[in-house]
């Protein structure tokens, strides 16, 4: 409604201005009375007064609304920044503690890994030495077992040879017995033959002697003359027979001597064989005792080898179990560290989301302030345009009245904004930016739009922790207490462009002064409509 009233008033003022440009001629021509001019002037000033009152009321309402919004936003911003700072400090503290804990855990893990590696190397060296010693012992025992096996082979060969020798001895004994038996039989047979022959020869000799005696007796009886000759012949024959028998007896004696010699040789061989048998029996008993001792030694060595192998396998199993337990413990520690890292990642992601939400909320607040600043600039432009129109209309009225001869001519005013002008409307507009009073408690509804813009800029600077822009001594504004967040003076700086470029942290929006405009494309249409309404 106030905007429509403004437009209607503007149209009326334009029509009145046009009509009033023509009225002086009519007044000069028609010579109307001064009362009508006074009424017209009064109605004009009443209209101007109404317009200014309406605009003042509208500006006051808008300034009150903006002050209230600014106050609420200031409180929200303060609480939000306080919460953000506390949350961020707490999160940073937690992050630092967790980083320290992670670093300690990493160092502890590295130390445990190094310690486990050293213990593993020591155990490997220790058990490598034990394995090498056991392998040396094993090789030594294997050599001893090989020697024992070779001895066993020789013993087996000796047993085989023994069996053969025993068989040979048995054969020799059998042959000796058979030869002795044959010798005894041949000796007995020869003796029997000798005695038989001797007996036969004796019998034959007796028979012949008897026969010869009888024959000789008969022949002697028959032929005594030829008796001597026959006896001689018979004697010669007997001598020959006796020599033959003696020769046979010698041969038989020689044969008996040979048989006796053979018998003595056989007896000697028998004795030698008995001695060899006894010696072999002694060797066999010694070898049997050696075999028994070697077998006992082999059994003891096998038992020792089995015991050492079982002990070595038990040590290997213990080492494997210990290594498995250590690996499981290391895996458990690694799982714990991974879970801790995952928790850390989740917390970091949560912190990132929280920071993103905080930044989004901050950008929303900053966007709201940008919208407010843009609205203030639009209001500044509209109010300046409206002021220029009113000032130009008033100047035209004064000029018409002066042309009519009612008043003096006013000072010449320019409305194009040239720098050479001494009485320009822009000077009045620049005066609106100054602070006319220096009181402490100032209501924001009583401020002009230019002063409100400066307040917003100071609010942005305080919000983002930047120094306020440098003011001249004449135009330095005493900012009200209910607008400033902290106590103390603002730091002055001469670089206005840096302040304008660094108005926001999260978005570098180019906020210009009254000559530079913020692009309305950045501002949502709903916010523009709500702020303008």
Swiss-Prot record:
Key word Coiled coil present: yes
Signal peptide: none
Disordered: annotated segments: 1-30, 507-533
Main location: cytoplasm
Keyword flag Cytoplasm: yes
Tissue specificity annotation: Expressed exclusively in the testis and predominantly expressed in male germ cells.
Comp. bias regions, Polar residues: 507-517
Biased composition (Basic and acidic residues): 20-30
Transmembrane domains' residue ranges: none
GO cellular component, one term: axoneme
Keywords per UniProt: Cell projection, Cilium, Coiled coil, Cytoplasm, Cytoskeleton, Flagellum
Deleted gene: phenotype: Mice show reduced sperm motility and male subfertility without obvious sperm morphological defects. Abnormalities in sperm flagellar axoneme seen, with an absence of one to three microtubule doublets in the principal piece and end piece of the sperm flagellum. Motile cilia are normally distributed on the epithelial cells of the trachea and the axonemal structure of cilia is intact.
Region (Interaction with MNS1 and ODF2): 277-533
Cellular localisation: Cytoplasm, Cytoskeleton, Cilium basal body; Cytoplasm, Cytoskeleton, Flagellum axoneme
GO biological process annotation, one example: single fertilization
Coiled coil regions in record: 34-207, 246-368
Biased composition (Basic residues): 7-19
Assembly and oligomerization: Interacts with MNS1 and ODF2.
Summary of the function given for this chain in its UniProt record: Plays an essential role in sperm motility and male fertility by stabilizing the sperm flagellar axonemal structure. May be required for the stability of ODF2 and MANS1 proteins. Dispensable for the assembly and function of motile cilia.
Sequence similarity: Belongs to the BBOF1 family.
PANTHER family: BASAL BODY-ORIENTATION FACTOR 1 (PTHR14845:SF5), COILED-COIL DOMAIN-CONTAINING 166 (PTHR14845)
Protein name (Swiss-Prot/TrEMBL): Basal body-orientation factor 1
Gene symbol of the encoding locus: Bbof1
């Amino acid at each position: 409604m106030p905007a429509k009233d403004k437009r209607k008033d503007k149209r009326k003022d334009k029509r009145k201005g046009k009509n009033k440009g023509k009225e002086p001629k009519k007044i000069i021509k028609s010579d109307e009375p001064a009362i009508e001019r006074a009424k017209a002037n009064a109605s004009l000033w009443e209209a101007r007064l109404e317009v200014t009152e309406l605009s003042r009321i509208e500006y006051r309402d808008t300034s009150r609304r903006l002050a209230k919004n600014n106050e609420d936003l200031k409180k929200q911003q303060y609480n939000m920044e306080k919460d953000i700072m506390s949350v961020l400090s707490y999160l940073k503290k937690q992050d630092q503690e967790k980083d320290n804990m992670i670093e300690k855990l990493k160092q502890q893990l590295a130390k445990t890994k190094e310690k486990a590696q050293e213990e593993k190397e020591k155990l490997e060296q220790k058990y490598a030495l034990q394995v090498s010693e056991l392998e040396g012992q094993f090789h030594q025992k294997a050599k001893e077992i090989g020697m024992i096996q070779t001895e066993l082979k020789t013993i087996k060969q000796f047993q085989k040879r023994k069996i053969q020798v025993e068989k040979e001895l048995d054969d020799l004994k059998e042959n000796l017995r058979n030869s002795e038996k044959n010798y005894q039989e041949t000796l007995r047979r020869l003796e029997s033959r000798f005695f038989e022959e001797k007996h036969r020869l004796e019998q034959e000799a007796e028979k012949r002697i008897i026969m010869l005696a009888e024959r000789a007796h008969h022949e002697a009886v028959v032929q005594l003359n030829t008796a001597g000759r026959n006896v001689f012949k018979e004697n010669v024959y007997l001598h020959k027979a006796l020599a033959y028998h003696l020769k046979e007896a010698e041969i038989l004696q020689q044969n008996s001597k040979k048989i006796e010699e053979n018998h003595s040789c056989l007896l000697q061989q028998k004795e030698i064989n008995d001695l060899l048998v006894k010696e072999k029996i002694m060797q066999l008993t010694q070898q049997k005792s050696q075999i028994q001792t070697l077998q006992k030694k082999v059994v003891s060595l096998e038992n020792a080898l089995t015991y050492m192998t079982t002990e070595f396998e038990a040590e290997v199993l213990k080492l494997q179990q210990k290594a498995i337990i250590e690996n499981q413990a290391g895996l458990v520690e690694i799982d714990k560290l991974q879970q801790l890292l995952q928790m850390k990642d989740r917390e970091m992601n949560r912190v990132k989301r929280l920071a993103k939400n905080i930044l989004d909320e901050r950008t929303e607040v900053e966007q709201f302030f940008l919208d407010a600043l843009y609205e203030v600039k639009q209001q500044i432009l509209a109010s300046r345009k409206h002021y220029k129109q009113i000032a130009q209309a008033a100047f035209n009225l004064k000029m018409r009245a002066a042309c009519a001869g009612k008043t003096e001519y006013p000072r010449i005013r320019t409305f194009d904004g040239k720098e050479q002008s001494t009485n320009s409307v822009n000077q009045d507009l620049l005066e609106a930016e100054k602070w006319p009073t220096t009181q402490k408690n100032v209501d924001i509804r009583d401020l002009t739009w230019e002063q409100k813009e400066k307040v917003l800029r100071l609010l942005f600077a305080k919000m983002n922790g930047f120094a306020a822009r440098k003011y001249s001594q004449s135009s330095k504004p005493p900012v009200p207490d209910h607008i400033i967040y902290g106590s103390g003076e603002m730091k002055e700086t001469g670089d206005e462009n840096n302040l304008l470029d660094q108005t926001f942290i999260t978005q570098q929006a180019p906020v210009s002064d009254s000559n530079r405009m913020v692009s309305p494309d950045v501002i949502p249409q709903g916010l523009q409509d709500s702020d303008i309404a």
